[in-house]
């Protein structure tokens, strides 16, 4: 990648409140002044959010300052789709993805590192076990847990940034396509939680995966942690079947419920970060990719549809409509 000169563009985001009094979602305006914007990833670093953006001109790295300022830190003419990103406390690490080379798109085994303070982008000497775009990653226990597809079989690796080394874990991994969970995995309380595929699952580095609930097959949800809960937003069970639902999960009690508020437009492939509010960036809708930032007041919302877990092993779920 050959970065262009640094762009410092402060974008004022206009607040356009929704008209439904019962809705808790506010539109903060455009992500960028572009005809098409793809949001490849988001990571939270203390009080700031970093985003990987794709446009017709290439790739940009942006910094979002809640509540309403976005700044482009670095732009490149590189055309690539890299979505598996984590924050390691100092840098953003980005794993695999798809790159445009020699007139075609191909999977890559590259690991990129972006330092927002130094505005420096580099390719690490280490690389994934094989080129793939079917990959998800999460930061936990001072390492990166990487879930990738190897010949239709999910494998789990631990990556240690301090010495750029890998260790393959001897654990189960029932996720069919980790890349479909790339924005749907979060770390909380010593475990990774997945909200994709056949339902909700937890991953313990020592014990592997455990299904918590089986739901409809939904991919590309946006998941984030906020106030001790995990929220899963939108998703898709097919390109034409995007979701507008917001689901809240309590990892301490196992309570799973659907929130009253719906997305103003159904979408999958969005990214989300939690804090005082949950910020939702981009996503794919029936009208194409959404060039929009949404702010969700989750504390002002409430559950209207609790999902009743049937037994300790949890093989199915049953909506319990009307339970408050």
UniProtKB/Swiss-Prot annotation:
Superkingdom, natural source: Archaea
Keyword annotations: Kelch repeat, Repeat
Kelch repeats: 229-276, 277-323
Matches recorded under InterPro entries: Kelch-typ_b-propeller (IPR015915), Kelch_1 (IPR006652)
Pfam families in alphabetical order: Kelch_1 (PF01344)
Protein's UniProt name: Kelch domain-containing protein AF_2170
Taxonomic source organism: Archaeoglobus fulgidus (strain ATCC 49558 / DSM 4304 / JCM 9628 / NBRC 100126 / VC-16)
